[in-house]
Amino acid sequence: SERENRRVSANETPAGPVAADTIEPGMKRRLFWLSNLAIFMIGLGFAVRANIAADLQGDIFNLLDLARSASMVGEVIGATFIGFALTLLFGSALLDRVGMKVMLLFAAVGYLAGSVMVIAAALMEASSSAYWLVYGGLLLTGLGWGAVEAGTNPLVAAIYPDEKTHRLNILHAWWPAGIVAGGLLGLALGALSLPWELNLLILILPAVVLAALVATAKFPVTERVAAGVGYGEMFREIGRSPGFLIWFFAMMMTATSELAPGQWVDLALSNVVGMQGIILLVYVSALMFVMRHFAGPLAERVSPVGLLWFSSLFAAIGLYSLSVASSPLPAFIAATIWG
């Protein structure tokens, strides 16, 4: 049958993706750890952008157009989210066409090239060219960010079909771990009065390592291909599953409550609560790292939907409390509830 033929085609040539059950345990561990590194890299990048936002404004945009400099920061940070949304939306849909290896190589190159472009903009005179270099560089890192999410989630699900919840929780714990590392490194660079561009050089390191690991790894096909489900059938299933649309919009709101506020914590709160906002971001991310390791057992006790409901409630209370905090102690209490 057509489905059986598609299932047979899942075992492709050695140069291409293969069925997950033909991959050796050692290679599976390598794929899992390079996925963790990729998630760590995007968390690190999140912290780096928070670290350098004020420096971009002070060293480049203020000299270019003082009246619009704050808006320019918003525009270039926004470019990151545009790139993230594009590759997450279209990259996920086209993953079987391009392959997980190409997707993750693209992510590594995006972070490498994007970081170099922002450094280049910092080294040249303030001009419209410098602005567009920063914009293009952060857009590239955003495209890489989305490519990581589009590639690593189905990769881990494919190699550990019987441990999905556990393995995916561990995988996504490396996102806040990257933020903690990036935030602390940024604080250290500032305390030592070192150039802020070093934040971007640090971000290049995991990108280079990731590219090397991905280039020499053997990747599986996705679960859809392995099961023999057709491409068109996959999209038709969306229309037959109203619950998918509910979770789609729920995820949009989740991203809104986590990603956007987190990116602006340092720039928005540093002058309001009497402390560096990046410290709050590091603290919240550390809480996330710990809680994500316990998410599996909690979900089993209260159900995934129940856990999401309680998490949303705490996030709403925490974000509102953070918006009205005016000193360090209330800010830390609000951040604890949010995290």
Language model features with spans:
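Extracytoplasmic
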Residues: R30-F61, N153, P261-L269
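Conserved MFS/SLC helix-loop-helix module at the cytosolic interface between two early adjacent transmembrane helices
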Residues: L86-A126, Y131
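Cytoplasmic helix-loop-helix junction between adjacent transmembrane helices
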Residues: G137-W174
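Central cavity-lining transmembrane alpha-helices of secondary-active solute carriers
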Residues: E75-A93, V282-F294
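Extracytoplasmic gate region of multi-pass secondary transporters
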Residues: R49-A50, R240-V290
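Helix-loop-helix hairpin linking two adjacent transmembrane segments in secondary transporters
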Residues: D162-E163, I170-T222
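C-terminal transmembrane helical hairpin of 12-TM major facilitator-type secondary transporters
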Residues: V305-G339
